[in-house]
Design a protein with these regions (language model features):
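Positively charged, small/polar-rich N-terminal and surface patches that mediate targeting and assembly
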Residues: 1-99
Length: 99
């Protein structure tokens, strides 16, 4: 009834988040959700003021697509931008929408 997939979550600076979402689609994601993200971490507190807004991008993908996306993030975004990403296992109804 459910399909085992990966949830990839990326939190990135507003300036680069749309490009990351574009890369995710190009690498095989069938869609994504992007919302404002507020919080605090190693680079200080992000309150969502102009110029310091972070966006959270979520996509449900296959393991193979998740690996491609993580490799792209590691090579092209982590060295230059305040960006973080993580993967989680998810069980999805209507899994055909994601693969």
């Amino acid at each position: 009834m459910t399909v085992a997939l990966k949830l990839i979550t990326v939190v990135a600076e507003e300036v680069v988040a749309p490009k990351i979402a574009e890369d995710m689609m190009r690498l095989g994601a069938s869609g994504y959700t992007m919302v404002e993200a507020h919080g605090q971490g190693s680079r200080g507190k992000r309150l969502g003021r102009v110029g310091e807004l972070n966006l959270r991008i979520d996509a449900v993908v296959s393991e193979a697509v998740a690996e491609k996306i993580m490799a792209r993030l590691s090579a092209h975004y982590f060295p230059r931008f305040a960006t973080i990403a993580w993967l989680g296992d998810v069980s999805v109804l209507r899994g055909d929408k994601y693969v």
